[in-house]
Amino acid sequence: MNLKLNVLTIILLPVHLLITIYSALIFIPWYFLTNAKKKNAMAKRIKAKPTSDKPGSPYRSVTHFDSLAVIDIPGADTLDKLFDHAVAKFGKKDSLGTREILSEENEMQPNGKVFKKLILGNYKWINYLEVNCRVNNFGSGLTALGLKPKNTIAIFCETRAEWMIAAQTCFKYNFPLVTLYATLGREAVVHGLNESEASYLITSVELLESKLKAALVDINCVKHIIYVDNKTINRAEYPEGLEIHSMQSVEELGAKPENLSVPPSRPTPSDMAIVMYTSGSTGRPKGVMMHHSNLIAGMTGQCERIPGLGPKDTYIGYLPLAHVLELTAEISCFTYGCRIGYSSPLTLSDQSSKIKKGSKGDCTVLKPTLMAAVPEIMDRIYKNVMSKVQEMNYVQKTLFKIGYDYKLEQIKKGYDAPLCNLILFKKVKALLGGNVRMMLSGGAPLSPQTHRFMNVCFCCPIGQGYGLTESCGAGTVTEVTDYTTGRVGAPLICCEIKLKDWQEGGYTVHDKPNPRGEIVIGGQNISMGYFKNEEKTAEDYCVDENGQRWFCTGDIGEFHPDGCLQIIDRKKDLVKLQAGEYVSLGKVEAALKNCPLIDNICAFAKSDQSYVISFVVPNQKKLTLLAQQKGVEGSWVDICNNPAMEAEILKEIREAANAMKLERFEIPIKVRLSPEPWTPETGLVTDAFKLKRKELKNHYLKDIERMYGGK
């Protein structure tokens, strides 16, 4: 075996020699042609600085230091004006695209479950003028049905073109839009609809039949339901007095001359645009009130960090539009003339679960240049690709590693490796269509390991951002020239960020070498508070002596010397153990989530106990293979319940924890393996795949008692 490895190593020597010669010959012309010197200088420059020498002073972007940006396009101070600007500028250009469903087939899985598989056609596009026509017709139709300006209308629907058309209608006609995640459970949906007192609801037939129908008995105010599909439903199955319309019929009503002639009542910057209900990761969803001016300011900051945004770009929309990251990204793309092609997590790639084998996924057909992704999705891509690499033979694996390491070194220096991109990473890039020039990451911290992998294999920068629903998604975004990892960039030009001492956690603005503390964001992008929840609004929001709004995030950050922010902890994730040690559950999870055997992990601790435990969703393929090697037999559920497999996972956890330099008391010493993945549909994670700790605790209550010895 050693002889074989030595022979292969000798055979691979010419590869190393070729790389050395290639680097020497190509580097100098490439360096000047790509303006690498300027990019390096941009990457290393100071990006933000404090407004004064006083500790705790707010940091601002150096490019907009004297005042915060509040508007991007002159005169467009409301969302409807952004829409009108885009329609006037890009009229006949493709705007919103949807793939045709050619056929559906049921496919039996080995476990007996039946999966619906789709065969999809090409994207069908409507242009900006056609979107405008539909918006006008839908708005006039809603007005004809009796909806008044400043009266709320709710949307509970999957991400699709009709969602965006409905939203643009509401912005133009001054109907405050109440947004609800399509994956919310019955209790959360009922709460949001009743609290917002929305009398009109936009949804899909699937959600109407599967979730809303049974909940209508508890929903007080909804009088009109508009479904977006071109389908028919049996109205006799619904309560009397509830009017149900198709979106098409409402548009046809609005297109009548007597209705279309009624002009919309336009909003002002201080009018409510959205009441966005959160995903409820920490309990009951809260409605965040966003004025037009808040969203305009937030998107002004976000767009400044995406160079070259314009008509040559194609954006793939698949994340929930009820999430502030996706909504602001799509409105920004629409404003700048980008095409938006709609997708879903189940049809995104050729290997996605709803795509029939041999058919093409949405990325392959659309070939997007821009896309947003939550870290959970990037982590899955990373693990899947690296799993394929491990299955290669020795020569292939070694060639991949040589190319990967070489490009990684080039990236760390601020350079690139065009030959590696062409030869080694072309197939990996093709997983997302092959044309992605920038990816936006948000919703949760992205691990440095996954960040580097995406840089290397997908040959594009990752704009890692930090923002919250309460800040209209705006806070920080890394610049495309900044190839560091583990940070979320400098404050956007629309806001300023300061740190506040958190003595209990041991973080202060006087810490060395860098100031640390709770992140507080200020600017016009800060929303107006929580809907009908003055107590929580007063707790989390404040207004300073200059009238500027601030939001206390609950996240702990550290400012680096160049003005970039790093998220290092979260107040709500901190647990004090019985012996007095503080454990950051988020820190533990971040350190362990990239273990090959682990698909997802939730750390758990109680203040009356002395150790940390964990719940783990194992990687089915890898754990099944390990079980075979260890002689463990049975179903997937049997494998997950086997103590020997728990021991193997704990062994991997210990190794990874030691490699990441976790303290002894931070390392989970007991584990419960979950045979079922945590998806938004299970209610255990949000649509951005953030852990719902309360729900996870309730779900694993018996296991918690068992792992803590029945106490």
Swiss-Prot record:
Gene3D superfamilies per the UniProt record, alphabetical: 3.30.300.30, N-terminal domain of ligase-like (3.40.50.12780)
What processes does the entry annotate via GO biological process terms? alpha-linolenic acid metabolic process; embryonic process involved in female pregnancy; fatty acid derivative biosynthetic process; long-chain fatty acid biosynthetic process; long-chain fatty acid metabolic process; neuron differentiation; positive regulation of insulin secretion; regulation of fatty acid metabolic process
Q: Could you list which ranges are Cytoplasmic topological domains?
A: 29-711
Q: What does this protein do?
A: Catalyzes the conversion of long-chain fatty acids to their active form acyl-CoA for both synthesis of cellular lipids, and degradation via beta-oxidation. Preferentially activates arachidonate and eicosapentaenoate as substrates. Preferentially activates 8,9-EET > 14,15-EET > 5,6-EET > 11,12-EET. Modulates glucose-stimulated insulin secretion by regulating the levels of unesterified EETs. Modulates prostaglandin E2 secretion.
How does its activity get regulated?
A: Both triacsin C and rosiglitazone inhibit arachidonoyl-CoA ligase activity.
CDD domains from the xrefs?
LC_FACS_euk1
Q: Which reaction does it catalyse?
A: a long-chain fatty acid + ATP + CoA = a long-chain fatty acyl-CoA + AMP + diphosphate; (5Z,8Z,11Z,14Z)-eicosatetraenoate + ATP + CoA = (5Z,8Z,11Z,14Z)-eicosatetraenoyl-CoA + AMP + diphosphate; 15-hydroxy-(5Z,8Z,11Z,13E)-eicosatetraenoate + ATP + CoA = 15-hydroxy-(5Z,8Z,11Z,13E)-eicosatetraenoyl-CoA + AMP + diphosphate; 12-hydroxy-(5Z,8Z,10E,14Z)-eicosatetraenoate + ATP + CoA = 12-hydroxy-(5Z,8Z,10E,14Z)-eicosatetraenoyl-CoA + AMP + diphosphate
Family recorded in the similarity comment:
Belongs to the ATP-dependent AMP-binding enzyme family.
Q: Which Gene Ontology cellular component terms are annotated?
A: endoplasmic reticulum membrane; lipid droplet; mitochondria-associated endoplasmic reticulum membrane contact site; mitochondrial outer membrane; mitochondrion; peroxisomal membrane; plasma membrane
Q: Where in the cell is it found?
A: Mitochondrion outer membrane; Peroxisome membrane; Microsome membrane; Endoplasmic reticulum membrane
GO: which molecular function terms?
Answer: arachidonate-CoA ligase activity; ATP binding; long-chain fatty acid-CoA ligase activity; very long-chain fatty acid-CoA ligase activity
Task: Give the EC number(s) under which this enzyme is classified.
Answer: 6.2.1.3, 6.2.1.15
Summarize tissue expression.
Answer: Abundant in steroidogenic tissues, also found in the kidney, brain and liver.
- Give the transmembrane ranges: 8-28
Q: Which cofactor does it need?
A: Mg(2+)
Chief localization: mitochondrion
Membrane-protein topology: Single-pass type III membrane protein
What EC class is this? ligase
Q: What is this protein called?
A: Long-chain-fatty-acid--CoA ligase 4
Which keywords annotate this record?
Answer: ATP-binding, Cell membrane, Endoplasmic reticulum, Fatty acid metabolism, Ligase, Lipid metabolism, Magnesium, Membrane, Microsome, Mitochondrion, Mitochondrion outer membrane, Nucleotide-binding, Peroxisome, Phosphoprotein, Signal-anchor, Transmembrane, Transmembrane helix
Q: Which residues carry this modification: Phosphoserine?
A: 447
Look up the coiled coil feature and give its residue ranges.
Answer: none
The stated induction of this gene product is:
Induced by adrenocorticotropic hormone (ACTH) and suppressed by glucocorticoid.
